[in-house]
Amino acid sequence: DVYKRQRLCLQAALQVAGDKKGFGILCDSRLGQEALFTAADTGLWVGRPAEWPGSRPLEVEPDLGADFGRLSEWPRDQVVKVLCFCHPDDDHGLWKRQIQTVKRLFEACRRNQLEFLLEVIPSKAGEIDDMTTALVIQRFYDESIFPDWWKLEPLLTVAAWRNVIDAIERNDAHTRGIVILGLGESEEKLGRSFSIAANYPLVKGFAVGRTIFADVAQQW
């Protein structure tokens, strides 16, 4: 079942990591509660989603409570991850609503001494060019939202990556860095993005589960 698959994925991550630093998982509490418990104090970086899957405008998991008070129960070494589907061309009303939700969650993370990861995927909300992701990032900074981590789609040009890095470094010298998401893309396409991103120290790693194990998981 899906719960056993989550446990197997965690076992694989722990086996590969061994005693080395720099490995981690993304795991939600609805399907992966046992894996989250097991991952505690293992040294793995643990990102835990807070969004209601697929929501646009953004909605947060009801389990967090109306004031996100349940975050006080999260272990301090878990990173609060939220995915916001947004695009520079979104109308004012949509931006306002999504900004309000993201800012409330960001502030709740600060109150509870939890790191905050903001994931944005503009390509799922409209056409993109080399400035699109950078403009989205700037929009959140303009609203005094300073994520500890950014999770960004695999950009394919030097210009797009340079614009993103400039936007982050211009606004926040203390951000932890960037994690690249996979979107289920081919290894070839991700490799092209990684080869560019590897030139920037701000890019810390990637989370591309479907590309790595989707076929195996389906067969299993």
Locations of regions flagged by a protein language model:
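Active-site cofactor/substrate anionic-group-binding motifs, chiefly glycine-
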Residues: 17-67
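Alpha/beta enzyme core
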Residues: 8-17, 39, 64-79, 94-95, ...
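N-terminal substrate-binding region of glycoside hydrolase catalytic domains
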Residues: 23-26, 47, 77-86
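Short, small-residue-biased leader/transition segments that mark boundaries at the very start
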Residues: 2-3
